[in-house]
Amino acid sequence: MVSSFTSAPRSGFYYFAQGWKLVLQPGIRRFVILPLLVNILLMGGAFWWLFTQLDVWIPTLMSYVPDWLQWLSYLLWPLAVISVLLVFGYFFSTIANWIAAPFNGLLAEQLEARLTGATPPDTGIFGIMKDVPRIMKREWQKFAWYLPRAIVLLILYFIPGIGQTVAPVLWFLFSAWMLAIQYCDYPFDNHKVPFKEMRTALRTRKITNMQFGALTSLFTMIPLLNLFIMPVAVCGATAMWVDCYRDKHAMWR
């Protein structure tokens, strides 16, 4: 079935909302199951453990607040909780994406074929097995780009004042951009678009991608909803690829 998507790009919020609709399309649901199971098992267990630890971690983080900011503690405490949720949520969503990367790529490929009527070159389990080394190499590229930037931001958390005020905002913006890269990369990688070229393409529509990544980041922090976010984000990012990038970067049509 060829999609009714227009070629006119929409906002990142629109594509995120489309993701929730697309995962339910007949013929697509079976490709959603494996990414969904990985996310439910990993994120469900991780967040259950996290909420048992918050009573210890938050007071420790608040101990870095200098005396002159103590009067703002009632505002800083929620920021500290959000900071922990952001860092923790992104860390475990990264692990989940590593494990599910081949299946996310297959989901993006099948959805793109359904939206455009195009025929992908290799499909099914044998196509996945053949592409696993390349897919894992691509995940390493993303991780190598992400890690040094994440370390710098994490160091900011231990600077009194900055760690409880500025750092959470910077981390949220960074997470939004990184999640846009993470999920938009699946359709780009299906067409063998180099990682650097993919980032350059995303920067041409930075606001759209930041909107998409910000909503994905927010939903990653929400219990229960975060269990479904991986396949939803893959579908939303694939819809964005079809509208905004496919004409210029597609390898198969």
UniProtKB/Swiss-Prot annotation:
Keywords: Amino-acid biosynthesis, Cell inner membrane, Cell membrane, Cysteine biosynthesis, Membrane, Sulfate transport, Transmembrane, Transmembrane helix, Transport
Highest rank taxon of the organism: Bacteria
Cellular component GO terms, alphabetical: plasma membrane
Transmembrane parts of this sequence: 31-51, 75-95, 151-171, 222-242
One BP term from GO: cysteine biosynthetic process
Pfam family, one: EI24
GO molecular function: high-affinity sulfate:proton symporter activity
Keyword Iron-sulfur: no
Membrane topology: Multi-pass membrane protein
Keyword Transmembrane: yes
Main localization category: membrane
Subcellular location per the Swiss-Prot or TrEMBL entry: Cell inner membrane
InterPro entries in alphabetical order: CysZ_sulfate_transptr (IPR050480), Sulfate_CysZ (IPR022985)
Family: Belongs to the CysZ family.
Role according to the record: High affinity, high specificity proton-dependent sulfate transporter, which mediates sulfate uptake. Provides the sulfur source for the cysteine synthesis pathway.
Name assigned to this protein: Sulfate transporter CysZ
Organism: Escherichia coli O6:H1 (strain CFT073 / ATCC 700928 / UPEC)
Gene designation: cysZ
